[in-house]
Curated annotation (Swiss-Prot):
Keywords (A to Z) from UniProt: Amino-acid biosynthesis, Cytoplasm, NADP, Oxidoreductase, Proline biosynthesis
A GO molecular-function annotation: glutamate-5-semialdehyde dehydrogenase activity
Family: Belongs to the gamma-glutamyl phosphate reductase family.
One GO CC term on file: cytoplasm
CDD domains assigned to the protein according to its UniProt record, in alphabetical order: ALDH_F18-19_ProA-GPR (cd07079)
Protein name, per record: Gamma-glutamyl phosphate reductase
NCBIfam families, per the entry: PRK00197.1 (NF001221), proA (TIGR00407)
Source organism of the structure: Escherichia coli O157:H7
Length: 417
């Protein structure tokens, strides 16, 4: 089965690579329109997935990721339309010039070819990834989690129908709908057909891909994100950022999971934090020093377990640790962070500059929420993933991250001397 999917995707990629920006946008507009026109079918499929997931004991955080509503589905369709408005990087000349030999040489952006994406219970990923791949002239093979099998199948049928109505092969966007985990291992060895693999899931999936894949892998999306409250931070303003970073949508990978508080501001900051977190329904997991100050406050507080500093809660839970200084905060982030998104809240710009220079994450913020690490917020459109590695892409992966380049030499029957 996968062999045939690979062949179909490879053949489709040759066709997609020849499309103009206008032709690709026409396809995307058709997909967006059909997602709305066929919304009832997709939402009914999703309702069945959610019901099964709830019956199987899936956590509330995962149920939130899985669930579609009419508003969310409309938002997904609108995101596809936003991709239409983005500049097409394919064909862009990165640099070039004329050599001494007279050969005109240029480096031009081209599609990668076929992208493979493995992801869990997030049905929006199906459309986000497909739209970005199509915009950049790439075919894609999707392998969603078993929790979203009905939703993904219904969504891909809508996308394929839109492709065919525009004269393009259905093989441009395909999904593996068999939940057999053995197929993941088989997919990881499809280097004959797949040019880049992107896993979007937990640490176990990333480890599996790194160890077994014969295809170049882009890992990321695991967000143990930190906010450091420096001793010069403005408490009221800092709390606004923390509430946003923790509670806006707790199930996302750019949500803050650990709050590091400078010891010199802890006495005045922690009572205010407790009050705010109680109002927001957040449970605090505090180290011994913070626990002593938080126990009398209104927020629910428990003693932090050492392993929780490495946890991506994806829920209304927040670690709180008192640190001695900036060096202590940076050391903690280096030990427990996932190089996703980390922030400092401070009025001391020297400390801010040190934090930016010394915290080696894909996105580092000064006096801003970690929630900004998002393709849409960065002006990249819908993202295919957030890469926490350094090759070939880093941070939110928009259109350019789905391209490579080729060298093109144009001569007049020019030969090398």
């Amino acid at each position: 089965m996968l062999e045939q999917m690979g062949i179909a995707a490879k053949q489709a990629s040759y066709k997609l690579a020849q499309l103009s920006s206008r032709e690709k946008n026409r396809v995307l507009e058709k997909i967006a329109d059909e997602l709305e026109a066929q919304s009832e079918i997709i939402l009914n499929a999703n309702a069945q997935d959610v019901a099964d997931a709830r019956a199987n004991g899936l956590s509330e955080a995962m149920l939130d990721r899985l669930a579609l509503t009419p508003a969310r589905l409309k938002g997904i369709a609108d995101d596809v339309r936003q991709v239409c408005n983005l500049a097409d990087p394919v064909g862009q000349v990165i640099d070039g010039g004329v050599l001494d030999s007279g050969l005109r040489l240029e480096r031009r952006r081209v599609p990668l070819g076929v992208i493979g994406v493995i992801y869990e219970a997030r049905p929006n990923v199906t459309v986000d990834v497909a739209s970005l791949c199509l915009k950049t002239g790439n075919a894609v093979i999707l392998r969603g989690g078993k929790e979203t099998c009905r939703t993904n199948a219904a969504t891909v049928v809508v996308i394929q129908d839109a492709l065919k109505s525009c004269g393009l092969p259905a093989g441009a966007v395909q999904a593996i709908d068999n939940p057999d985990r053995a197929l993941v291992s088989e997919m990881l060895r499809m280097d004959k057909y797949i040019d880049m693999l992107i896993p979007r899931g937990g640490a176990g999936l990333h480890k599996l891909c790194r160890e077994q894949s014969t295809i170049p892998v882009i890992t990321g999306g695991i967000g143990v994100c930190h906010i450091y409250v420096d001793e010069s931070a403005e408490i009221a303003e800092a709390l606004k950022v923390i509430v946003n970073a923790k509670t806006q949508r707790p199930s996302t990978c750019n949500t803050v999971e650990t709050l590091l508080v400078n010891k010199n501001i802890a006495y005045s900051f922690l009572p205010a934090l407790s009050k705010q977190m109680a109002e927001s329904g957040v449970t605090l997991h505090a180290d011994a020093s913070a626990l002593a100050q938080l126990q009398t406050g209104p927020a629910k507080v428990v003693a932090v377990k050492a392993e929780e500093y490495d946890d991506e809660f994806l829920s209304l839970d927040l670690n709180v640790k008192i640190v001695s200084d900036l060096d202590d905060a940076i050391a903690h982030i280096r030990e427990h962070g996932t190089q996703h998104s980390d922030a400092i809240l401070t009025r001391d710009m020297r400390n801010a500059q040190r934090f930016v220079n010394e915290v080696d994450s894909s996105a580092v913020y000064v006096n801003a929420s970690t929630r900004f690490t998002d393709g849409g917020q960065f002006g990249l459109g819908a993202e295919v993933a957030v890469s926490t590695q350094k090759l070939h892409a880093r941070g939110p992966m928009g259109l350019e991250a789905l391209t490579t380049y080729k060298w093109i030499g144009i001569g007049d029957y020019t030969i090398r001397a």
